[in-house]
Amino acid sequence: MAAAKTLAVIFFILLTGAVACAQALTVFPVMIPLSRGQKATSLTITNKGTSETAVQIRAYGWSQKDGDGDIQLTATNLVALSPPIARIAPGASQVVRLILRQTPEKREATYRILIDQIPPPAEPGVVHIVLRMSIPIFAQPEVRSFADVQFHLERKDGQIDLVAINAGNLHELIRDIVLTTSDGRKLKAESSASPYILAGATRRWHIAAQDSLPLSSETLQLTAHANSGAIEEQVRFVQAQ
């Protein structure tokens, strides 16, 4: 959908000869970890453009739909942001303060801050391209926290999925997934928009096979990288649900 919107804007610009203008905004940090018991922090938005810009800052609860890891956002009042709207002069920065109203008890709480650039008034012959940035927040629970990701393979509808179930109470980040067959063939997972698997979530990665797929009786070698370190383990097929 985002790609379609981008192509539509480009087509409009080419068709009309309009000038495309986009403000350069940066945010720091790009990920916000809140340690056990921590309730307050801040982030900084900097306008690197040549004109004033306005932004709206909102917080949402963040969960994952089991399977593809799509970001699911829900309204929340558990994160307070100040200011919620800001005007930033060129070359200037705005500090946004964040307060967590409720600390999680048993499982890591996850949120996302959406920073939306507010478009300026319309100008003849000018298309303003506005920015949206999404910043993840990870709030550790009061109890001891860890990720516990278990992997297996499923065969369904002529394709193979690598399935990961995070039974822990902390998120994990998984990337660079490769499966090696018994005859040495390398099978890579299809790219995913998000590398995260949240606490209690299930993720699926489709495995692209250039030749024949491995047999369901075969055990494959999994290698990947995670926050907790390198992953190297054998994975087996189980009956698809």
Describe every region a protein language model picked out.
Residues D70, T74-T103, K186-L213:
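Intrinsically disordered, low-complexity Pro/Gly/Ser/Thr-rich segments with frequent PxxP/GP/PP motifs
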Residues A8-A18:
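Bacterial N-terminal signal peptides
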Residues Q23-T26, K48-V95, I177, D183-R185:
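Surface-exposed binding patches on compact interaction domains or structured appendages
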Residues Q23-G49, I85, V143-R155, S194:
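Beta-sheet-dominated interaction scaffolds and their linkers
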